[in-house]
């Protein structure tokens, strides 16, 4: 039996056990998958205790992705560039850290929503860890360019410079967003958690695909996109399921089908 879990704080709301148990049923693997509430200041002890119990791997959510990055003994290229880890695989005496967030986002956009990213103008709201985790997979799709807007502009500018070798990027203040047309807007800020939306120019959403990394039937960003005439509006549930599928394959070597799981969770 595979022994998996997800670490977070809070963690009660997590859909990960539901998703991975569906993957297990689909692929025929015996899997246990727990939710573990780790102390805010001591992720490593909780993670090590789980490993000592015979864990095969685990997922990591807010606020422990940087802790997991430091905890891993080895890092994949994705994790190194993302600067954060959301998936760990235990392989003999190795603790291998991976980041599946960006691949999950791209898979949801391209496979589930049918969106072509090549040559598109993409605007990302926010310049924190979530943005850093999705930039490389997005840039690999060869968009025209990726703009990063953040309330603290130097973070956006630095992130854009750090990723410039992978594709055309720029960073600036949220207040500097103009009405210039963009094809895709991705909300990577945490404002949806607090029922808010960044104060940005309304016209920028006109006819744009608007995607919230947060998931929920109607997030504040989705409300904003609706009012401002976004052409296609989606939450991040598909991304959650797609990144989980990449993690499941990382652990087991078998790629699960996400379509039915997404349908089940939507209903």
UniProtKB/Swiss-Prot annotation:
GO molecular function: NADP binding; shikimate 3-dehydrogenase (NADP+) activity
Entry keywords, A to Z: Amino-acid biosynthesis, Aromatic amino acid biosynthesis, NADP, Oxidoreductase
Keyword Oxidoreductase carried by entry: yes
Sequence positions that bind NADP(+): 126-130, 150-155, 213, 236
Pathway: Metabolic intermediate biosynthesis; chorismate biosynthesis; chorismate from D-erythrose 4-phosphate and phosphoenolpyruvate: step 4/7
Reaction catalysed by this enzyme: shikimate + NADP(+) = 3-dehydroshikimate + NADPH + H(+)
CDD domains: NAD_bind_Shikimate_DH
Stretches that traverse the bilayer: none
GO CC annotations on file: cytosol
InterPro entries, per the entry: Aminoacid_DH-like_N_sf, NAD(P)-bd_dom_sf, SDH_C, Shikimate_DH, Shikimate_DH-bd_N, Shikimate_DH_fam, Shikm_DH/Glu-tRNA_Rdtase
Described function: Involved in the biosynthesis of the chorismate, which leads to the biosynthesis of aromatic amino acids. Catalyzes the reversible NADPH linked reduction of 3-dehydroshikimate (DHSA) to yield shikimate (SA).
Protein family (similarity comment): Belongs to the shikimate dehydrogenase family.
Name of this protein: Shikimate dehydrogenase (NADP(+))
Organism: Ruthia magnifica subsp. Calyptogena magnifica
Lineage: Bacteria, Pseudomonadati, Pseudomonadota, Gammaproteobacteria, Candidatus Pseudothioglobaceae
């Amino acid at each position: 039996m595979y022994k998996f879990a997800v670490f977070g704080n809070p963690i009660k709301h997590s859909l990960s056990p539901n998703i991975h148990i569906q993957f297990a049923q689909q692929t025929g693997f015996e899997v246990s998958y727990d939710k573990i509430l780790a102390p805010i200041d001591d992720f490593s002890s909780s993670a090590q205790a789980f490993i000592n119990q015979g864990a095969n791997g685990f997922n990591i959510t807010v606020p422990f992705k940087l802790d997991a990055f430091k905890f891993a003994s080895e890092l994949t290229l994705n994790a190194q560039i993302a600067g954060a880890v959301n998936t760990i695989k235990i392989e003999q005496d190795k603790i291998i850290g991976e980041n599946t967030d960006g691949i999950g986002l791209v898979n949801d956009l391209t496979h589930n929503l049918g969106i072509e990213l090549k040559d598109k103008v993409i605007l990302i709201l926010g310049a924190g860890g979530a943005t850093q985790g999705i930039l490389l997979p997005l840039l690999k799709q060869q968009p025209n360019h990726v703009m990063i807007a953040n309330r603290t502009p130097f973070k956006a500018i630095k992130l854009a410079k750090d990723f410039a070798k992978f594709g055309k990027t720029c960073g600036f203040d949220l207040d500097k967003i103009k009405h210039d047309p963009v094809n895709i807007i991705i909300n990577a800020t945490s404002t949806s958690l607090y029922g808010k939306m960044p104060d940005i120019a309304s016209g920028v959403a006109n006819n744009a695909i608007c995607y919230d990394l947060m998931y929920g039937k109607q997030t504040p960003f989705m409300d904003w996109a609706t009012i401002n005439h976004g052409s296609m509006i989606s939450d991040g549930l598909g991304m959650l399921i797609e990144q989980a599928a990449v993690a499941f394959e990382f652990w087991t070597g078998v790629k699960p089908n996400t379509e039915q799981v997404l349908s089940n969770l939507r209903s």
